Amino acid sequence: MDAGDASRLGESLDAVSAAFQSRVMELQELVLARNMYPATAIPDLAAVDVSLTAMEAQLQAVRRRLQEEREAFPKAKKLVQQSLKQQRRLQLMLANMPTGMREDVFATPLEHNSSMMFPESLNFSSAVPEVRDHDLKIKEEPTAPPKKGRGPAPRWYISTEELDSLSSYMRGRLTLEKVNIAINEVASYADGNAHLVACPKKKLSEDTWEKALVLRDIAARESVKGKHFFLETDIKGPGLKLDTTGKAILTVLRHLGRFQETRIGHHRVFILSKQQ
């Protein structure tokens, strides 16, 4: 039932109520005509009045209920739209996920059952086991947890359309899988750096503490504060190296807005962008 149906039903109930009241008035006149003495007509009229009052109360209750449902329609519609938008986003992420990472999608159960929803119509690789929706979760890289109060580093994978939109010179021999594996790898670098920034000194070795001090100084800069980042010196493979292919991948990711690049001191800093 939509809002228009509810409105028409309310109008129909008004018409029924008016017809009922008209019929009661006719019955009252007939009772008076049948009973020549008012004393004998009063009990009949009282019984009719009681019945009418009960009917009116029921009609009012129905109208209130219809009004409540009509007011709930916009909220329900908005919720459905948000659910569809989230579903499309997850479908896009899954469609552009590297095949080498899909096996990890089903590794552990969800921490929050409502955080991931995959439609049953999606067809996965035959190597992926059949599972139920509440068993799905993208496995995080085995890095230390990020700073408390901050979520994991964004993994904004590129789509086939974005890769095809690049010039052949920029794209070169890059594939969707190579680029998205690199995205996952740099996000793991950023997660590791966030952990070092938040970790107390007593839990770090002397060498690691020196790096943590450098990262904390960078994280305190206004352009970096509150964001996930990694350094050029973090890039050590295996999915991304500072070779010709790795530099081409960094150029593509910068062009597609996956990160912003800046220089702080003698460090080349890459600040990850969140998906719009």
From Swiss-Prot:
Pfam families cross-referenced by the UniProt entry: SKA1 (PF07160)
Source organism superkingdom: Eukaryota
This protein's GO CC annotations: mitotic spindle; outer kinetochore; spindle microtubule
A single BP term in Gene Ontology: attachment of mitotic spindle microtubules to kinetochore
Gene3D superfamilies noted in UniProt: Ska1 microtubule binding domain-like (1.10.10.1890)
Record-linked InterPro entries: SKA1, SKA1_MBD_sf
One Gene Ontology MF term: microtubule binding
Stretches assigned to coiled coil: 48-78
Keyword list, A-Z: Coiled coil
Keyword Coiled coil recorded: yes
Family per record: Belongs to the SKA1 family.
UniProt name for this protein: SKA complex subunit 1 homolog
Organism (species): Oryza sativa subsp. indica
Species classification: Eukaryota, Viridiplantae, Streptophyta, Embryophyta, Tracheophyta
